[in-house]
Structures are given as structure tokens and as C-alpha cells.
Amino acid sequence: MGTFRDAPDVYGCIGKIFEEAIADPEIGPKTREAALSICFNFTDPESVIYVDFARGDVFFGDDAPDTEPAIRMGMKADDANKFWLGKLNLVMAMAKGQVRAKGSVPEMLKMLPLAKPLYARYEALLRDQGRDDLIQAAG
């Protein structure tokens, strides 16, 4: 079993950082320029986050649109947590099969530099929520 309690727990942490990225005055416009949609299918616990960067929308679970995203990604929620804490190299994780990706992966990789400034914000978000357990679990 993973560190997250349930799907709403994933949405309140990982989903929240996507919302903050889109709302950020510097990062948000750059994500909209990329005009990608990414559907993240997490395990441990089962949860779905669909991010439509072009429209600036984040959807959780059954609220995810039926439209096919440009990219589908699959991973454990704990691995997404590690990524947002700067402790998981996404390219290496994909090479090892720890993270699966289908679709416009090269376009998604171009967006990776936008994530780095959010690592500290994600850690602060977890601390504000009293989720030191997620920080410690990332190693």
C-alpha cells in the first residue's frame, strides 16, 4: 500500500500542485502555450488526474473528460510524489518502466523544466497540510 490514504488525498496534494502551476503568473502561460493534455493514471491508490494545459483545467477522477489526451501516463502515486519533491528523475523512471507514457512524450519532456520551480512549492504545500509523512516517504 502506498503513502496516500485514498484518491481524494492524491487530488489534494498532487492535483493541487497542477492547479497551482496553471494559476502561476509565470508558469501558467507557458503551460498554456504547450497546449497539451495529460491524463495521469495512478495506482496505490487508484486515482486519475486529467490536466488540460491549453484550457487551464484540472479534472479529478470521474470528472475527467472523455476526450483522448495527448499523453497518458501511468505510475504509482508515491512516484508522482517523489517527482514533485525533486526525488525522481522522470526520464530514468520511464526508461526503467517505473513510469509508463504513451502519446506525445517528446512534447511533455519539453515541459519538464517548468516543474523544477514547483518542487519547493509542493514541499511547502505538503508541510502546510501536515503531510510530513509524504516528504519522509520520498526519501
Predicted regions and their residues:
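Feature captures hydrophobic
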Residues: M1-G139
